[in-house]
Regions:
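Catalytic Walker B motif of ABC-type/P-loop ATPase nucleotide-binding domains
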Residues: 164-168, 173
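Conserved beta-strand-loop-alpha-helix hinge in the C-terminal portion
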Residues: 80-81, 85, 211-243, 249
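Helix-to-loop junction immediately C-terminal to a conserved catalytic motif
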Residues: 52
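A short, flexible loop at the N-terminus of ABC-type nucleotide-binding domains that lies
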Residues: 1-8, 12-25
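ABC-family P-loop ATPase nucleotide-binding domains
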Residues: 75-142, 245
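ABC nucleotide-binding domain "signature motif"
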Residues: 58-66, 216-217
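Hydrophobic anchor residue at the start of the ABC signature
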Residues: 153, 181
Length: 251
């Protein structure tokens, strides 16, 4: 069995004002649960969109080994959007309704594919998200931020993707919602990249990758292991600096 993966091959990205956000990034994200960390503004969300194919790199290339589903940290929808649209299943539900009404358009059958039970699967996923009484036609504008995120997460699990990229998925979630998210991430059997500042969520990752102005650096283990490594690196850097100061005084 071939594992899903995402690969960066010498990827650079230049902003509209001509500034290079990052340059020559090369790394591979495999089937392990991976957390992407870094300070605000360093380019984590841009990197996520590059990996998902929503943006094109200024140089280099992104390789996607499988179907990717990307969940932005900004859950946006127009005023007429519904729960089904937010979950990404509205086109299939509409095609299914046309078929059930006697329609025979081949494009509708192509759209439905094997998803004849999509209504039941959506309802089951919404129940797992703690939203059991939420009809698909409910207006998205009536949802709180946490409810909208949970609907979007339901759509992510339903997407049948080989690789999930989740950007700050615990935003707006309460304690119960965060715990449910962790449990689903632990059950997810395929590729996973989570961009987050949530240390409790990152503690369940199998690998941490840090994006900094110097590029990407990979750390095995969860957030605690990463934090220990970074603390040792800072201590070593401080000791080296003190040693150099001492040597200069002796000159």
């Amino acid at each position: 069995m071939t594992h899903p993966y995402l690969a960066l091959e010498g990827v650079s990205y230049v902003l509209a004002d001509g500034r290079a956000l990052f340059s020559e990034l090369t790394d591979t994200f495999d089937h392990r649960r991976t957390g992407l960390v870094g300070r605000n503004g360093v380019g984590k969300s841009v990197l996520a969109r590059l990996l998902a194919g929503e943006l094109s790199p200024s140089a280099g290339r992104c390789v996607r080994g499988g179907k990717v589903h990307y969940l932005s940290q900004q859950i946006s929808s127009d005023g007429a959007a519904t729960v089904a649209q937010l979950a990404g299943v509205q086109p299939v539900l509409r095609a299914l309704a046309r078929i059930e009404s006697g329609g025979s358009d081949p494009s509708d059958f192509d759209l439905v594919g094997d998803d004849w039970d999509i209504r039941q699967r959506l309802q089951a996923e919404l129940e797992r998200q703690g939203l059991p009484a939420l009809p698909p036609e409910t207006g998205a504008a009536t949802l709180s931020g946490g409810e909208a995120m949970r609907v979007a997460l339901a759509g992510a699990w339903l997407a049948q993707a080989d690789f999930l990229i989740l950007d700050e998925p615990s935003n707006h979630l309460d304690r119960a919602g965060r715990q449910a998210l962790v449990e689903q991430l632990l059950r997810w059997p395929k590729g996973l990249l989570v961009i987050s500042h949530d240390r409790q969520l990152l503690a369940h990752m199998e690998r941490i990758v840090e994006l900094s102005p110097q590029g990407l650096r990979s750390y095995g283990g969860g957030y605690d292991f990463y934090a220990d490594c970074r603390a040792r690196e800072r201590d070593n850097a401080a000791q080296t600096l003190e040693q150099r100061k001492l040597e200069r005084r002796r000159e």
